[in-house]
Regions:
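Predominantly extracellular beta-rich ligand-binding scaffolds that present long acidic/polar faces
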Residues: 1-136
Length: 136
């Protein structure tokens, strides 16, 4: 049986420091021992920071790190930093489980786990229309 998180928002600063730290706006870690976690129709506008002495410190706007999950129809406009892998949407262990229909505010970084959109595209409703089209 799958577990689902939907229609959630993160508007705050989230920071995690420690060995193998993994932090996200909605979820920090979904590992292969857990049930499949479905995250949909969620967003983050807060600052997410992951730091680790051993170099992991993974950080994602929606999910810090996932191996057994499905992420769809989400967006991030918050700042994401970390000492390990960093993703505007989610750090994924497997290429075949990339998030779908997810967007992030474009800057100088590119992210394979989402689609970059400009501030104008967020403001004029383009992103909203794409998210609405992706709902069930």
């Amino acid at each position: 049986m799958d577990e689902t998180i939907e229609n959630c928002a993160s508007l705050c600063t989230v920071s995690c420091t420690g060995i193998d730290a993994r932090v996200g706006g909605i979820v920090g870690l979904v590992d292969y021992n857990s049930r499949t976690l479905i995250i949909r129709d969620c967003y983050n506008i807060g600052k997410i920071t992951g730091r680790s002495d051993n170099g992991s410190g993974d950080a994602g706007g929606i999910c810090g790190f996932y191996m057994n999950g499905k992420i769809s129809n989400c967006y991030n406009v918050g700042e994401i930093t970390g000492s390990g892998y960093v993703s505007k949407i989610a750090v994924s262990a497997y290429n075949d489980s990339r998030p779908t229909n997810c967007y992030y505010l474009s800057d100088t970084d590119t992210d394979l786990n989402g689609t970059a959109k400009t501030a104008a595209e967020f403001a004029n409703g383009d992103v909203l229309e794409e998210l609405k089209a992706g709902q069930r």
